[in-house]
Regions:
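Jelly-roll (double-stranded beta-helix
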Residues: 1-158
Length: 158
């Protein structure tokens, strides 16, 4: 029985992945599948690195861990969970296309090169309640945000 489950959602200009797993699980990702630019860990902890490399990043989540993983593109990677984990990845569809990513904490000004993604909870954005893995193309306008302890990212095509 698998102790680590992966989900993938292809969107219009990017893809989202989700991983949910038990403690003490090792997951390997082949270079041909490595399109993740940003990792958002919402529960648990673990470490990730390039295979056969002694350098790795540790995500110890007391809140949220948001990591830029661009340096891992083009490499086989390995992830080890220290405790039950739930994490999401923001993936480019084209390795030549770069994106900027960040988590939002307040209301903000959007632009038409950006997308909003909900990773945890039920925030209210401009009066609309979102669910996990909901996403929307932004416009050049102001967005009123009520996070309600949710985790929401904004990703901008460069």
């Amino acid at each position: 029985m698998s102790r680590f489950h992966r989900y993938f959602k292809k969107c219009e200009e990017f893809a989202l992945c989700a991983e949910v797993g038990d403690a003490n699980v090792i997951q390997v990702e082949d270079v041909s599948e490595r399109y993740t630019l940003y990792q958002i860990v919402v529960k648990g902890s673990g470490r990730m690195g390039k295979i056969f490399d002694s350098d790795y990043i540790v995500g110890d989540v007391n809140g949220v861990y948001f990591a830029d993983l661009k340096e891992y593109l083009g490499h086989h990677t390995v992830f080890e969970s220290f405790e039950p984990v739930q994490m999401y990845g923001f993936n480019t569809l084209d390795l030549k296309q770069d994106w900027d990513g960040k988590l939002i904490e307040n209301s903000f000004q959007g632009d038409d090169k950006s997308w909003l993604v909900c990773f945890k909870g039920n925030p209210i954005i401009n009066g609309k309640e979102l669910r996990v893995m909901d996403y929307a193309k932004l416009e050049n306008k102001h967005y009123n945000v009520q996070l309600n302890d949710a985790i929401v990212g904004v990703f901008t095509k460069l």
